[in-house]
Protein backbone atom coordinates (compact mmCIF):
# COMPACT_ATOMS: atom_id res chain seq x y z
CA UNK A 1 0.00 0.00 0.00
CA UNK A 2 1.37 3.41 -1.03
CA UNK A 3 -0.27 5.25 1.88
CA UNK A 4 2.40 6.02 4.51
CA UNK A 5 0.50 8.12 7.05
CA UNK A 6 -3.13 8.46 8.08
CA UNK A 7 -4.53 11.12 10.42
CA UNK A 8 -7.72 10.40 12.40
CA UNK A 9 -9.92 13.21 13.70
CA UNK A 10 -11.86 12.53 16.89
CA UNK A 11 -13.56 14.18 19.80
CA UNK A 12 -11.56 14.10 23.03
CA UNK A 13 -14.10 12.31 25.25
CA UNK A 14 -13.12 9.00 26.84
CA UNK A 15 -15.52 7.06 24.60
CA UNK A 16 -14.56 8.91 21.40
CA UNK A 17 -10.88 8.24 22.10
CA UNK A 18 -11.58 4.55 22.76
CA UNK A 19 -13.36 4.35 19.40
CA UNK A 20 -10.65 6.24 17.49
CA UNK A 21 -7.90 4.18 19.11
CA UNK A 22 -9.72 0.98 18.16
CA UNK A 23 -9.77 2.14 14.52
CA UNK A 24 -6.09 3.12 14.81
CA UNK A 25 -5.20 -0.32 16.22
CA UNK A 26 -7.10 -2.17 13.48
CA UNK A 27 -5.37 -0.10 10.79
CA UNK A 28 -1.92 -0.74 12.30
CA UNK A 29 -2.61 -4.48 12.50
CA UNK A 30 -3.69 -4.59 8.87
CA UNK A 31 -0.97 -2.26 7.55
CA UNK A 32 2.16 -2.69 9.75
CA UNK A 33 4.09 0.08 7.96
CA UNK A 34 1.32 2.68 8.22
CA UNK A 35 1.88 5.57 10.63
CA UNK A 36 -1.50 6.43 12.20
CA UNK A 37 -2.02 9.49 14.39
CA UNK A 38 -4.97 11.04 16.25
CA UNK A 39 -6.01 14.68 16.29
CA UNK A 40 -8.36 15.62 19.14
CA UNK A 41 -10.96 18.20 18.14
CA UNK A 42 -13.43 20.01 20.42
CA UNK A 43 -16.95 20.33 18.99
CA UNK A 44 -19.73 22.70 19.98
CA UNK A 45 -21.48 19.79 21.72
CA UNK A 46 -18.39 19.38 23.91
CA UNK A 47 -18.19 23.08 24.72
CA UNK A 48 -21.79 23.63 25.86
CA UNK A 49 -22.29 21.33 28.84
CA UNK A 50 -24.77 23.28 30.96
CA UNK A 51 -27.65 23.20 28.45
CA UNK A 52 -29.64 20.17 27.20
CA UNK A 53 -28.64 19.38 23.60
CA UNK A 54 -32.24 19.73 22.43
CA UNK A 55 -32.13 23.36 23.58
CA UNK A 56 -28.82 24.06 21.83
CA UNK A 57 -30.59 23.13 18.60
CA UNK A 58 -29.18 22.43 15.16
CA UNK A 59 -27.59 19.31 13.68
CA UNK A 60 -24.05 18.01 13.74
CA UNK A 61 -23.28 19.25 17.25
CA UNK A 62 -20.56 16.62 17.65
CA UNK A 63 -19.17 16.51 14.09
CA UNK A 64 -19.14 19.98 12.47
CA UNK A 65 -15.70 21.07 13.69
CA UNK A 66 -14.24 17.67 12.79
CA UNK A 67 -15.61 17.97 9.25
CA UNK A 68 -14.15 21.48 8.99
CA UNK A 69 -10.73 20.03 9.91
CA UNK A 70 -11.12 17.45 7.15
CA UNK A 71 -12.05 20.10 4.59
CA UNK A 72 -8.93 22.07 5.59
CA UNK A 73 -6.80 18.96 5.04
CA UNK A 74 -5.82 18.59 8.72
CA UNK A 75 -7.15 15.00 8.94
CA UNK A 76 -7.75 12.11 6.53
CA UNK A 77 -10.64 10.32 8.25
CA UNK A 78 -13.02 10.95 11.14
CA UNK A 79 -14.43 8.35 13.52
CA UNK A 80 -17.94 9.10 14.76
CA UNK A 81 -20.61 7.46 16.87
CA UNK A 82 -23.22 6.90 14.15
CA UNK A 83 -26.00 8.29 16.34
CA UNK A 84 -24.25 11.70 16.23
CA UNK A 85 -23.86 11.88 12.45
CA UNK A 86 -26.27 14.15 10.51
CA UNK A 87 -28.00 12.70 7.45
CA UNK A 88 -26.38 15.28 5.15
CA UNK A 89 -22.67 16.03 4.66
CA UNK A 90 -20.63 19.03 3.51
CA UNK A 91 -19.81 18.91 -0.20
CA UNK A 92 -16.89 16.58 -0.85
CA UNK A 93 -17.25 14.54 2.35
CA UNK A 94 -19.17 11.35 3.00
CA UNK A 95 -19.60 8.29 5.15
CA UNK A 96 -17.50 5.51 3.64
CA UNK A 97 -17.76 2.74 6.28
CA UNK A 98 -20.17 1.66 9.00
CA UNK A 99 -18.65 -0.80 11.46
CA UNK A 100 -20.26 -3.87 12.98
CA UNK A 101 -22.75 -2.83 15.61
CA UNK A 102 -22.03 -3.23 19.30
CA UNK A 103 -25.03 -3.91 21.60
CA UNK A 104 -27.73 -1.46 20.38
CA UNK A 105 -29.81 -1.52 23.57
CA UNK A 106 -30.24 1.08 26.29
CA UNK A 107 -29.03 0.11 29.75
CA UNK A 108 -30.38 0.93 33.21
CA UNK A 109 -27.86 1.93 35.86
CA UNK A 110 -29.47 1.98 39.29
CA UNK A 111 -28.89 0.58 42.73
CA UNK A 112 -29.61 -2.91 41.46
CA UNK A 113 -33.30 -2.21 40.73
CA UNK A 114 -34.85 -3.06 37.36
CA UNK A 115 -36.79 -0.39 35.45
CA UNK A 116 -40.24 -1.85 36.13
CA UNK A 117 -39.50 -2.03 39.86
CA UNK A 118 -38.36 1.57 40.29
CA UNK A 119 -40.58 3.47 42.77
CA UNK A 120 -43.43 5.75 41.76
CA UNK A 121 -42.11 9.20 40.92
CA UNK A 122 -38.58 7.88 40.38
CA UNK A 123 -36.06 10.41 39.06
CA UNK A 124 -34.42 9.14 35.88
CA UNK A 125 -31.31 10.70 34.35
CA UNK A 126 -31.05 10.65 30.56
CA UNK A 127 -29.41 12.70 27.83
CA UNK A 128 -31.90 11.91 25.05
CA UNK A 129 -35.44 13.10 24.30
CA UNK A 130 -35.96 9.78 22.48
CA UNK A 131 -35.44 7.84 25.72
CA UNK A 132 -37.40 10.35 27.75
CA UNK A 133 -40.45 10.07 25.47
CA UNK A 134 -40.43 6.25 25.36
CA UNK A 135 -39.90 5.79 29.10
CA UNK A 136 -42.60 8.34 30.00
CA UNK A 137 -44.98 6.50 27.68
CA UNK A 138 -44.41 3.37 29.80
CA UNK A 139 -44.11 5.11 33.18
CA UNK A 140 -45.73 8.58 33.09
CA UNK A 141 -45.23 8.86 36.87
CA UNK A 142 -41.47 9.17 36.49
CA UNK A 143 -39.53 12.43 36.54
CA UNK A 144 -36.99 12.77 33.74
CA UNK A 145 -33.79 14.69 34.51
CA UNK A 146 -31.66 15.71 31.51
CA UNK A 147 -27.98 15.00 32.24
CA UNK A 148 -24.89 15.89 30.19
CA UNK A 149 -21.24 14.90 30.25
CA UNK A 150 -19.16 11.88 29.31
CA UNK A 151 -20.17 8.31 30.20
CA UNK A 152 -18.43 8.19 33.57
CA UNK A 153 -19.76 11.63 34.56
CA UNK A 154 -23.33 10.53 33.81
CA UNK A 155 -22.87 7.29 35.76
CA UNK A 156 -21.64 9.31 38.75
CA UNK A 157 -24.73 11.54 38.60
CA UNK A 158 -26.75 8.63 40.00
CA UNK A 159 -25.30 9.50 43.41
CA UNK A 160 -24.29 13.12 42.83
CA UNK A 161 -27.83 14.17 41.85
CA UNK A 162 -29.63 11.56 43.98
CA UNK A 163 -31.27 9.90 40.97
CA UNK A 164 -33.06 6.55 41.07
CA UNK A 165 -31.59 5.44 37.74
CA UNK A 166 -29.54 6.63 34.79
CA UNK A 167 -30.21 5.35 31.26
CA UNK A 168 -27.24 5.09 28.89
CA UNK A 169 -26.39 3.34 25.62
CA UNK A 170 -25.12 -0.17 26.32
CA UNK A 171 -22.47 0.13 23.58
CA UNK A 172 -20.52 2.86 25.36
CA UNK A 173 -20.71 1.05 28.69
CA UNK A 174 -19.36 -2.15 27.13
CA UNK A 175 -16.57 -0.38 25.25
CA UNK A 176 -15.39 1.40 28.39
CA UNK A 177 -15.78 -1.58 30.74
CA UNK A 178 -18.69 -0.33 32.87
CA UNK A 179 -20.96 -3.37 32.46
CA UNK A 180 -20.69 -4.14 36.18
CA UNK A 181 -22.80 -1.00 36.77
CA UNK A 182 -25.73 -2.24 34.66
CA UNK A 183 -28.89 -3.38 36.47
CA UNK A 184 -30.79 -4.23 33.28
CA UNK A 185 -30.63 -3.99 29.50
CA UNK A 186 -33.89 -2.67 28.03
CA UNK A 187 -35.27 -4.70 25.09
CA UNK A 188 -35.25 -2.82 21.78
CA UNK A 189 -39.05 -3.10 21.51
CA UNK A 190 -39.42 -1.31 24.87
CA UNK A 191 -36.80 1.40 24.24
CA UNK A 192 -36.12 1.66 20.51
CA UNK A 193 -32.51 2.79 20.04
CA UNK A 194 -31.29 6.03 18.52
CA UNK A 195 -30.56 6.02 14.79
CA UNK A 196 -27.25 4.18 14.34
CA UNK A 197 -26.82 3.43 18.05
CA UNK A 198 -23.91 1.08 18.71
CA UNK A 199 -22.26 1.49 15.29
CA UNK A 200 -19.29 3.64 14.33
CA UNK A 201 -19.04 5.61 11.10
CA UNK A 202 -15.84 6.48 9.28
CA UNK A 203 -16.05 9.67 7.23
CA UNK A 204 -13.53 10.77 4.60
CA UNK A 205 -13.10 12.90 1.50
CA UNK A 206 -15.02 11.31 -1.36
CA UNK A 207 -12.22 12.03 -3.84
CA UNK A 208 -9.47 10.32 -1.80
CA UNK A 209 -9.47 6.86 -3.38
CA UNK A 210 -6.32 5.76 -1.53
CA UNK A 211 -7.83 6.43 1.90
CA UNK A 212 -11.17 4.89 0.89
CA UNK A 213 -9.43 1.72 -0.26
CA UNK A 214 -7.45 1.51 3.00
CA UNK A 215 -10.56 1.67 5.23
CA UNK A 216 -12.90 -0.50 3.14
CA UNK A 217 -12.39 -3.48 5.46
CA UNK A 218 -14.17 -1.72 8.35
CA UNK A 219 -17.54 -1.82 6.59
CA UNK A 220 -20.00 -4.40 7.96
CA UNK A 221 -22.71 -4.96 5.32
CA UNK A 222 -25.57 -6.09 7.61
CA UNK A 223 -25.00 -3.19 10.00
CA UNK A 224 -24.65 -0.77 7.09
CA UNK A 225 -27.99 -1.86 5.59
CA UNK A 226 -29.73 -1.48 8.97
CA UNK A 227 -28.20 1.91 9.75
CA UNK A 228 -28.81 3.25 6.25
CA UNK A 229 -32.50 2.35 6.64
CA UNK A 230 -32.65 4.10 10.01
CA UNK A 231 -30.93 7.20 8.62
CA UNK A 232 -33.26 7.31 5.60
CA UNK A 233 -36.20 7.39 8.00
CA UNK A 234 -34.58 10.22 9.97
CA UNK A 235 -33.78 12.12 6.76
CA UNK A 236 -37.38 11.86 5.52
CA UNK A 237 -38.64 13.12 8.88
CA UNK A 238 -36.11 15.99 8.65
CA UNK A 239 -34.95 15.06 12.14
CA UNK A 240 -31.74 15.75 13.99
CA UNK A 241 -30.24 13.53 16.67
CA UNK A 242 -31.94 15.58 19.41
CA UNK A 243 -35.60 14.99 18.54
CA UNK A 244 -37.79 12.12 19.82
CA UNK A 245 -37.39 9.89 16.76
CA UNK A 246 -36.13 6.33 17.13
CA UNK A 247 -35.52 3.56 14.60
CA UNK A 248 -33.96 0.14 14.66
CA UNK A 249 -33.14 -2.12 11.73
CA UNK A 250 -32.42 -5.84 11.96
CA UNK A 251 -31.05 -7.92 9.08
CA UNK A 252 -31.69 -11.66 8.79
CA UNK A 253 -30.33 -13.27 5.66
CA UNK A 254 -31.21 -10.90 2.83
CA UNK A 255 -34.22 -9.39 4.63
CA UNK A 256 -34.40 -6.23 6.72
CA UNK A 257 -37.01 -5.38 9.35
CA UNK A 258 -37.19 -1.72 10.36
CA UNK A 259 -39.12 -0.39 13.35
CA UNK A 260 -39.67 3.34 13.84
CA UNK A 261 -41.12 5.61 16.51
CA UNK A 262 -42.02 9.30 16.72
CA UNK A 263 -43.25 10.88 19.95
CA UNK A 264 -43.99 14.09 21.76
CA UNK A 265 -41.38 14.95 24.40
CA UNK A 266 -43.73 13.94 27.23
CA UNK A 267 -44.51 10.59 25.59
CA UNK A 268 -48.27 11.25 25.67
CA UNK A 269 -48.61 11.24 21.89
CA UNK A 270 -46.70 8.77 19.75
CA UNK A 271 -46.78 6.69 16.61
CA UNK A 272 -44.94 3.44 15.96
CA UNK A 273 -44.69 1.11 12.98
CA UNK A 274 -42.52 -1.34 11.09
CA UNK A 275 -41.76 -2.49 7.55
CA UNK A 276 -39.87 -5.44 6.10
CA UNK A 277 -38.25 -6.07 2.75
CA UNK A 278 -35.00 -6.81 0.90
CA UNK A 279 -31.99 -5.43 2.78
CA UNK A 280 -30.61 -4.00 -0.48
CA UNK A 281 -33.63 -1.67 -0.56
CA UNK A 282 -32.75 -0.31 2.90
CA UNK A 283 -33.12 3.39 2.07
CA UNK A 284 -36.42 2.84 0.28
CA UNK A 285 -37.71 0.94 3.33
CA UNK A 286 -36.65 3.78 5.63
CA UNK A 287 -38.47 6.38 3.56
CA UNK A 288 -41.56 4.17 3.24
CA UNK A 289 -41.77 3.74 7.02
CA UNK A 290 -41.14 7.44 7.64
CA UNK A 291 -43.99 8.41 5.33
CA UNK A 292 -46.26 5.90 7.05
CA UNK A 293 -45.40 7.32 10.49
CA UNK A 294 -45.80 10.93 9.33
CA UNK A 295 -49.19 10.11 7.81
CA UNK A 296 -50.32 8.36 11.01
CA UNK A 297 -49.74 11.44 13.16
CA UNK A 298 -45.98 11.90 13.18
CA UNK A 299 -46.15 15.08 11.12
CA UNK A 300 -48.27 16.87 13.74
CA UNK A 301 -46.10 15.56 16.59
CA UNK A 302 -42.88 16.78 14.97
CA UNK A 303 -44.37 20.16 14.05
CA UNK A 304 -45.00 20.77 17.75
CA UNK A 305 -41.54 19.48 18.77
CA UNK A 306 -39.75 21.67 16.21
CA UNK A 307 -41.78 24.73 17.20
CA UNK A 308 -40.68 24.23 20.80
CA UNK A 309 -37.07 23.71 19.65
CA UNK A 310 -37.06 26.95 17.64
CA UNK A 311 -38.44 29.00 20.55
CA UNK A 312 -35.77 27.61 22.87
CA UNK A 313 -32.94 28.24 20.39
CA UNK A 314 -33.75 31.94 20.52
CA UNK A 315 -33.03 31.98 24.24
CA UNK A 316 -29.58 30.38 24.06
CA UNK A 317 -26.45 32.27 22.96
CA UNK A 318 -24.08 29.85 21.19
From Swiss-Prot:
Pathway: Porphyrin-containing compound metabolism; protoporphyrin-IX biosynthesis; coproporphyrinogen-III from 5-aminolevulinate: step 2/4
Stored Pfam families: Porphobil_deam, Porphobil_deamC
A GO molecular-function descriptor: hydroxymethylbilane synthase activity
Biological processes per GO annotation: protoporphyrinogen IX biosynthetic process
Origin: domain of life: Bacteria
Cofactor(s) the protein requires to work: dipyrromethane
Alphabetized Gene3D superfamilies for the sequence: Periplasmic binding protein-like II, Porphobilinogen deaminase, C-terminal domain
Note on cofactor: Binds 1 dipyrromethane group covalently.
Residues where S-(dipyrrolylmethanemethyl)cysteine is found: 241
Note: The porphobilinogen subunits are added to the dipyrromethane group.
Record family assignment: Belongs to the HMBS family.
Role: Tetrapolymerization of the monopyrrole PBG into the hydroxymethylbilane pre-uroporphyrinogen in several discrete steps.
Protein name: Porphobilinogen deaminase
Organism: Geotalea uraniireducens (strain Rf4) (Geobacter uraniireducens)
Organism ancestry: Bacteria, Pseudomonadati, Thermodesulfobacteriota, Desulfuromonadia, Geobacterales
